[in-house]
Amino acid sequence: MLINNKKLLHHILPILVLALLGMRTAQAVAPGIVIPPKALFTQQGGAYGRCPNGTRALTVAELRGNAELQTYLRQITPGWSIYGLYDGTYLGQAYGGIIKDAPPGAGFIYRETFCITTIYKTGQPAADHYYSKVTATRLLASTNSRLCAVFVRDGQSVIGACASPYEGRYRDMYDALRRLLYMIYMSGLAVRVHVSKEEQYYDYEDATFQTYALTGISLCNPAASIC
């Protein structure tokens, strides 16, 4: 029996090693989420996940990825307080600042919800940045009237872009950009998308891509090698 066990281990150990290496490789290449800066945090959400216009509920992953915000929350949350997150809860100062997972919306039963504003002034100058041969997915009409889309290439998210009718220097272009977004989203056409990085948006929860102000969309010529 001992000999058989040794033979079994001899065959299994290489497989286990390869499996562990595969797990580490998968973890290494998995894209991390974009963490909102602490400056976007606001505690002004009410019960049932009611975040003010222009804000949304903070997610568990975003909070876990922001050590500065965790330190700040441990300082400002009084006593045995509990707060709602988009997909969890935060147990305040007396609990030790514990972050707990829950299904989306389950934490909205508490009196206050942690919210973040969804627009960030990056300080970058106005400049044209473009991404070629991308298609629009995940169309989102946000609570603050922005229309956003995620642009992908070969199945990978490349960039997010939003158009707004009310804010930013490109608001006068909203109607034209909105029509173009709907058209390319429905048709699946490959395009070149143009963005400005003066403003960064956080409308998508746990995004693995940056999202900026949409400034233009150019259709690709299928007969041309350059888009």
UniProtKB/Swiss-Prot annotation:
Q: Sorted alphabetically, which InterPro entries does this protein's record hold? A: APT_dom (IPR005138), APT_N_sf (IPR037015), CTDL_fold (IPR016187), Enterotoxin (IPR008992), ToxinB_BORPE (IPR003899), ToxinB_su2/3_C_BORPE (IPR020063)
**GO terms of molecular function:** toxin activity
Q: Which Gene Ontology cellular component terms are annotated?
A: extracellular region; host cell plasma membrane; membrane
**Keywords attached to this entry:** Disulfide bond, Host cell membrane, Host membrane, Membrane, Secreted, Signal, Toxin, Virulence, Whooping cough
Q: A Pfam family name for this chain?
A: Pertussis_S2S3
- According to its UniProt record, where is this protein located? Secreted; Host cell membrane
Could you list the residue ranges that cross the membrane?
none
Renumbered to this chain, the signal peptide range is: 1-28
Q: What's the subunit arrangement here?
A: Pertussis toxin contains five different chains, S1-S5. They are organized into 2 functional subunits: A, composed of S1 (which is toxic) and B, containing S2, S3, S5, and two copies of S4 (B binds to the membrane receptors). Dimers of S2-S4 and S3-S4 are held together by S5.
User: What does this gene product do?
Assistant: PTX oligomer B binds to receptors on the eukaryotic cell surface and facilitates the translocation of the toxic subunit across the cell membrane.
Q: Which family does it belong to?
A: Belongs to the pertussis toxin S2/S3 subunits family.
Q: What is this protein called?
A: Pertussis toxin subunit 3
Q: Which organism is it from?
A: Bordetella pertussis (strain Tohama I / ATCC BAA-589 / NCTC 13251)
